[in-house]
């Protein structure tokens, strides 16, 4: 293997010496134009508005017009509806609701679960594929049951929600053969219940979901323990062996054949890396071969559990001083998921990466 590697290097040097043409990176001009329209100022405006609602805890008020999850979801719906009016009938938006009873865990009152969904209908009647981009609009303080205290949630997951809104803003002006769904889900912090509701409905209706891009915590460039500051890398988490309809015999055969890395989720992650790095400059997409961070979860999981192909997209360096923290200053350290800790150029790149992948997938 080492000799082969040396031969490849030598051949590369040889051919470049004799004037071989450089590799040309192919881009779809229409998609490249959409990528260029992703705006850090627009993303900042989306997140500023989301933060202004004080808290977006799933258990918070739905009747107050200026505070709580109800006000936030109504604003997101208003954005989707505004884009729908300019789409020539291609985009439609709605509140997707379901009743949820107290579960003795993270829900202590009856809820009307409400996801905000915008659908860009595919132009090809024979193409039934559906691609989903998701972020969760809800957030939490240190106590997940605290529904009244301030919880800015700028990054977790204002960043993912803003990316969804921005992609809808730009992509709704175009048409694609396949259908794209933009969704801001609720109930993530309460146990992935909003995405669970959507995934279960998709399974029951036999929706042909080809891929789910779940964006969660993707807008900050620094970590609190290593002090790394880097806005050039983003992680994509993908599962190997799926728990969906996986029996022991199939698992053993997969292991015997060495096919753990051939799962649809891992193939999607590879596609995301190749496409995203082709369209977005100065961004390295790091594939992480595990479903999620250690002992963590996200809204891609309910889809995976029902047999759909899904991945999680997350910033490279997380800062736990700015996740699920009550806003405060302690021992000179500023805690809280505040907008001041966001890097909007980094979020622009990560949003553009999502858009480039959605557009290429829906046109393929």
Where are these regions (language model features)?
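Bacterial Sec-dependent N-terminal signal peptides
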Residues: 1-23
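N-terminal capping segment at the start of a domain
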Residues: 21-68, 280, 322, 330-337
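Second-shell loop/turn segments in exported
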Residues: 29-38, 56-69, 102-107, 146-157, ...
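A non-catalytic alpha/beta surface segment that caps or lines the substrate-entry region
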Residues: 42-121
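Structural recognition of the beta-strand scaffold that forms the well-ordered cores
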Residues: 43-52, 59, 92-95, 115-119, ...
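Active-site-adjacent mobile loop/cap segments within catalytic or ligand-binding domains
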Residues: 51, 220-238, 286-363
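Alpha-helical metal-binding/catalytic segments enriched in His/Glu/Asp
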Residues: 118, 133-192, 354
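Metal-dependent peptidase/peptidase-like ectodomains
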Residues: 185-298
């Amino acid at each position: 293997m080492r000799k082969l590697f040396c031969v490849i290097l030598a051949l590369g040097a040889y051919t470049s010496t004799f004037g071989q043409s450089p590799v040309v990176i192919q881009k779809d001009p229409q998609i490249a134009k959409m990528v260029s329209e992703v705006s850090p100022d627009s993303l900042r405006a989306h997140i500023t508005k989301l933060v202004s609602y004080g808290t977006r805890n799933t258990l918070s008020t739905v009747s107050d017009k200026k505070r709580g999850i109800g006000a936030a979801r109504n604003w997101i719906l208003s954005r989707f509806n505004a884009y729908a009016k300019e789409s020539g009938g291609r985009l439609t938006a709605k509140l997707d609701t379901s009743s949820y009873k107290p579960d003795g865990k993270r829900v202590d009152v009856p809820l009307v679960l409400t996801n905000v969904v915008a659908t860009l209908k595919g132009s090809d009647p024979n193409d039934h594929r559906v691609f989903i981009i998701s972020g969760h609009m809800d957030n939490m303080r240190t106590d997940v049951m605290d529904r009244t205290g301030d919880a800015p949630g700028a990054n977790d997951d204002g960043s993912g929600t803003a990316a969804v809104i921005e992609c809808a803003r730009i992509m709704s002006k175009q048409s694609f053969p396949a259908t794209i769904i933009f969704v801001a889900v609720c109930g993530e912090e309460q146990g992935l219940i909003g995405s669970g509701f959507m995934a279960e409905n998709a399974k029951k209706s036999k929706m042909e979901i080809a891929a789910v891009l779940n964006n969660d915590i993707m807008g900050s460039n620094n970590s609190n323990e290593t002090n790394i500051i880097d806005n050039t890398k983003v992680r994509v988490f993908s599962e190997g062996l799926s728990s969906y309809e996986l029996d022991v015999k199939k698992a053993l055969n997969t292991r015997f054949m060495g096919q753990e890395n051939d799962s649809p989720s891992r193939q999607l992650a590879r596609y995301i890396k190749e496409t995203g790095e082709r369209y977005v400059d100065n961004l390295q997409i790091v594939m992480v071969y595990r479903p999620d961070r250690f002992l963590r979860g996200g809204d891609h999981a309910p889809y995976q559990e029902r047999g759909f192909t899904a991945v999680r997209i997350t910033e490279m360096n997380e800062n736990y001083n700015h996740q699920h923290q009550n806003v405060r200053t302690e021992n000179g350290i500023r805690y809280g998921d505040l907008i001041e800790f966001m890097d909007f150029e980094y979020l622009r790149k990560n949003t553009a990466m999502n858009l480039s992948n959605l557009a290429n997938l829906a046109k393929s």
